[in-house]
Amino acid sequence: MARSKVTDVPMALAVKIELFKRGCFDFITVKDGLKHEKQEHALKILTDNEHVELLYGGAAVGAKSWTGAVWLLFMCLCYPGSKWFIGRAELKRITQSTLITFYKVCNQYGVDDTLYKYNGQYNYIEFFNGSRIDLLDLQYKPGDPLYERYGSIEYTGGWIEEGGEVNFGAYDTLKTRIGRHLNNELGLRRKLFITCNPKKNWMYDTFYKPDKKGELPEYMYYLACLVQENPFIDPDYIEGLKTTKDKVKRERLLKGNWEYDDNPNALCSHDAICEIFGNKISIKTGTNYITGDIARF
């Protein structure tokens, strides 16, 4: 239900809302004469009429969480009655991290707590104009492998935070739930925003590999952003990443390397394992093989 009391939006905020609707994002992406070009690019994709799914990330500290929070905040302010979600592998990670970022974003752009209310009992943020953001627990549950608990909820769009922690089933279900709430009335394309660090899971197979091959469908977009491309980051943080002794962590978070190997002693690569189910040689010859470590049984 929308909040019934009449609330006046401060003039300074009203100007920002209008700028956002017009696609002018400098008040977000520019600071001290420097512009976060990748963040600008992400916001343009998130507000265009061409793309549906955006995977943004590829390394640590690319302003991914800030971008997600500011996008949802201003979409709610710009489009009364719209309905969105933020989903993470565990709800407590939203309340302990993502929600804190959301509050910082509100403070940064002059959105005080008279304009929205957080309901901690039912886990949603409701705005004065009837817009709403649901906070979703995307943890995999054996009793609900298809995420049917979200199968009948309708959203305008949404954001999956830290996609590397999230099960494919959550992504596969939620992308069918967007574009279902006032999109036609508000003139909005359905949008699913996914932020991440490199991880060899469904993001690697669904976004990164097809993009690398030039085969990513036109409605999908992968936007890589390395830590060095964030002009607002403390240089000392980058130096800290460079000194880590964990090679995999350094490759993922500093270099944005998706091709890293979790286990250098692995007998089979990730790609080889994924190709088991569509191996052209087995299809051609009709011969299949299976191996087993019998000593373990």
Task: Indicate residue ranges for each PLM-predicted region.
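Walker A (P-loop) phosphate-binding loop of P-loop NTPases
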Residues: 61-62
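Walker A/P-loop NTP-binding motif
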Residues: 65-80
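Conserved Walker A/P-loop ATP-binding site and its immediately adjacent core
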Residues: 82-102
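ATPase catalytic-site recognition across NTP-hydrolyzing enzymes
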Residues: 230-295
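ASCE P-loop NTPase helicase motor core
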Residues: 165-236, 240, 244
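Pre-P-loop entry segment of helicase/translocase ATPase cores
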Residues: 1-53
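Walker B catalytic acidic pair
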Residues: 161-162
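Inter-Walker segment of RecA-like/P-loop motor cores
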Residues: 95-156
